[in-house]
């Protein structure tokens, strides 16, 4: 055998070994192409999932491609119950109608709380009259009957300016919208419609920053890095276990005193997708690292016991939801995980 031919044969053999080794990394499919994990949903949960996805893809060295979209919690669930994505990011629990659609389409799901958020009521930094508001005052502003009627600051408190309120809030497909309206107005989606709405929280940040008479609500993770551009309003709730107005902060959320605007955040994983090795690895990686990564993007990790319970739910492939198809205000996340899930 000629030396050149021997060298070529050896080179081909080495390439075959290397190709086999690369193809054997978790996640790649039988053709050797990178596996794809499709995620969509909440803009609130997006920063956490994006951070986890980046770390996971780095670890997998190109063997897995994770796509993370933002279409709002409702938009993400629409895709999820049609079987179009593997994971749905959600800033509120799955609703009754979404549960019904999933069942009709044969979609089973694993519900996993992954972090806490504090919905933050914000005003412009030039606003020198508002430091706190009661839940009753917020309801007066945001309930459906307020549309076209409660339009000026002095209608909330007589001593406040007779200036028109510029309202900014979440769009109707947002889980933030569902939770805020449930917590403040008493019913999901019960809201006035004459305000600037967006599923993109950065749009709301810019709107409040640009108007001295603005009032809005956004997730804490979008407030924290922009706290010089807007001011958080302390919230007073007559049902709270402490008296007085409470500002949103990691300490107050973990202490259980920032109510009713503290909430758990979720990912929903398709049971069918869990049969894909890449998805199973990603979900395990998510629960292992989310506590650290959530803090990096200004969210609040759950207690360690909650993550352990979530891991048990994954390992046993326990499907269904711990909720009754509606958001529940002020509920400890451990209680959610202890409930028998239902489809």
Spans of features found by a protein language model:
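Bacterial N-terminal signal peptides that target proteins for export
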Residues: 1-9
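Short, linear, compositionally biased motifs with a strong N-terminal bias
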Residues: 11-14
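C-terminal motif of bacterial Sec signal peptides marking the signal peptidase cleavage site
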Residues: 17-21
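Flexible loop/hinge segments at secondary-structure junctions
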Residues: 22-343
């Amino acid at each position: 055998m000629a030396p050149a031919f021997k060298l070529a044969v050896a080179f081909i053999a080495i390439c075959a070994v290397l190709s086999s080794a690369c193809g054997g990394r978790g996640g790649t499919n039988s053709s050797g192409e990178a596996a794809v994990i499709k995620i969509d949903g909440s803009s609130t949960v997006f920063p956490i999932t994006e951070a986890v996805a980046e770390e996971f893809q780095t670890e997998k060295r190109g063997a897995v491609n994770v796509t993370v979209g933002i279409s709002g919690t409702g938009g993400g669930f629409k895709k999820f119950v049609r079987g179009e994505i593997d994971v749905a990011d959600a800033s509120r629990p799955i609703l009754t109608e979404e549960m019904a659609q999933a069942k009709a389409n044969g979609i089973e799901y694993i519900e996993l709380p992954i972090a806490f958020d504090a919905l933050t009521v914000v005003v412009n930094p030039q606003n020198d009259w508002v430091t706190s508001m009661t839940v009753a005052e917020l309801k007066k502003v945001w309930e459906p009957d307020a549309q076209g009627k409660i339009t000026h600051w002095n209608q909330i408190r007589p001593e406040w300016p007779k200036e028109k309120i510029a309202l900014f809030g979440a769009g109707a497909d947002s889980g933030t919208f569902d939770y805020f309206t449930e917590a403040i107005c008493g019913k999901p989606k019960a809201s006035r419609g004459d305000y600037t709405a967006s599923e993109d929280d950065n749009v709301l940040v810019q709107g409040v920053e640009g108007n001295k008479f603005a009032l809005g609500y956004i997730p804490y993770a979008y407030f924290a890095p922009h706290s010089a551009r807007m001011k958080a309003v302390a919230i007073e709730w007559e049902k709270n276990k402490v008296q007085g107005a409470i500002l949103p902060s990691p300490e107050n959320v973990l202490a259980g005193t920032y109510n009713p605007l503290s909430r758990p955040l979720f990912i929903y994983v398709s049971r069918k997708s869990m049969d894909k090795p890449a998805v199973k690895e990603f979900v395990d990686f998510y629960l292992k690292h989310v506590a650290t990564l959530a803090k990096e993007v200004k969210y609040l990790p759950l207690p360690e016991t909650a993550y352990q319970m979530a891991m048990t739910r994954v390992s046993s492939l326990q499907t269904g939801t711990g909720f009754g198809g509606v958001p529940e205000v002020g509920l400890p996340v451990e209680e959610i995980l202890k409930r028998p899930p239902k489809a």
